Design a protein with these regions (language model features):
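Aromatic (phenylalanine/tyrosine) cluster motif
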Residues: 6-9
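Chalcogenol-based redox active-site neighborhoods
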Residues: 13, 18-184
Length: 184
């Protein structure tokens, strides 16, 4: 993909996207999406449906790069990535940051999971995890920022675990995520 093509890229969702006012829950079909990740070869597109069937998927939404709790979460997940691979899972991190900021964050902090850019917040909305107003008490009134959340998607594309945190400093229960993966 050329830089010009990348700059014109708009993330896509399938037309069967569920009501975005409700969070996706266990038993729901995972909404498909295509997002950008920055690799050593340049920007690449990642489509969820292309990954379905190859392994189980763990989607981790975080509010934004270069923030304390998000950095802690993704560094801990990166350090324990072998555990997820043993459980036949691919872990993907999603935030609303642009892919170049995500790549700089990953390089600075040693984050090794693929980071997907939901720059227009379409996927956060499709999964029902977008804040209407993110931290207005701190004057960070940014709509669409993802709530910290975790989803386990099985090889058939069905959500088997869903956890959405209302407070941005609260981490998902990663032991529960792993317990779910052990059942798949």
């Amino acid at each position: 993909m050329t830089l010009a093509g990348f700059l014109l890229y708009i993330p896509s969702l399938t037309p069967t996207t569920p009501d975005i006012t409700m969070s996706i829950k266990a038993g729901d079909q995972a909404p498909d999406f295509t997002l950008v990740t920055k690799t050593a070869e340049g920007p690449q597109l990642v489509t969820l449906s292309a990954l379905i069937g190859k392994s189980n998927i763990v989607l981790l939404f975080v509010p934004m790069a270069f923030t304390g709790t998000c950095t802690i979460e993704f560094c801990e997940i990166s350090a324990g990535l072998a555990d997820y691979r043993t459980l036949d899972a691919t872990v993907l991190g999603i935030s609303g940051d642009n892919p170049f900021a995500q790549a700089a964050w990953a390089e600075k902090e040693g984050i090794t999971i693929p980071l997907l850019s939901d720059y227009e917040h379409q996927v956060a909305k499709a999964y029902g995890v977008a804040y209407d107003r993110f931290l207005p008490e701190a004057n960070l009134i940014m709509g669409g920022v993802a709530k910290r959340s975790a989803f386990v998607i099985d090889k058939t594309g069905v959500v088997r675990y869903a956890e959405v945190q209302e407070h941005p400093k609260d981490l998902p229960d990663f032991e529960a995520v792993k317990a779910c993966l052990r059942t798949l």
